[in-house]
A protein has these predicted regions:
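Basic, glycine/lysine-rich polyanion-binding surfaces/domains
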Residues: 1-191
């Protein structure tokens, strides 16, 4: 990855969850420890069926009083529905922000140019008020910025990033053993 390259991940979607007991709600559902997620750390997690079969995978990021979930766009409706089923009477709000926010990825080298950036998978900081995090699955995959669509192009210009071919990003991802697309085929099949 070139230090100036940015990849607009238009196949990703964003959910926002917040509410009184959001931490306990997520702790009882996801495959990772929600206590690891804070303003300076994000994590990779899955949602499993009651039988322990894989349903959804995502990255979870602390944001304001709740959590952002960065997931595959083809899975967002199903994940939203599944989380809503588990919500029951909890005072939890689940919002699909996919039409307002976008996920962009750029290299580790560029991430390390930010003040206070650390070379640790999942390390999270803010660019203005938007979260930037080093991919928790493999830091070599670089960082992701979740940003409001209206601010995207101005922010990319200020960060001196230029749009690059998304195929390069996914080719690199595959070389690292991370398959970020078409996980619907695996639902309810893997333990």
């Amino acid at each position: 990855m070139n230090i100036k390259d940015v990849y607009i991940l238009d196949d990703r979607a964003i959910l926002y969850l917040n509410g009184e007991n959001i931490k306990n709600f997520l702790q009882n559902l996801i495959s990772n420890d929600i206590n690891k997620v804070n303003d300076s750390n994000s994590c990779f997690a899955s949602l499993l069926s009651p039988q322990g079969k894989f349903l959804y995978e995502f990255i979870i990021i602390k944001h304001k009083s709740g959590y952002l979930i960065d997931c595959e766009k083809s899975q967002v409706d199903g994940l939203f529905k599944q989380l809503s089923v588990y919500k029951l009477r909890s005072k939890i709000e689940i919002l699909n922000l996919s039409n307002e926010f976008v996920v962009v990825a750029f290299g580790l080298e560029k991430f390390l140019t930010f003040d206070q950036a650390k070379d640790i998978p999942g390390f999270t900081l803010k660019y203005r008020e938007d979260p930037i995090f080093l991919d928790p699955r493999n830091k070599k995959l670089g960082a992701r910025l979740i940003i409001n669509l209206e601010k995207l192009y101005l922010s990319l210009k200020k960060l001196e990033l230029q749009n690059a071919d998304i195929k390069e990003y996914y080719l690199f991802s595959h070389k690292l053993g991370i398959v970020p697309k078409d996980l619907n085929k695996l639902q309810n099949k893997l333990f």
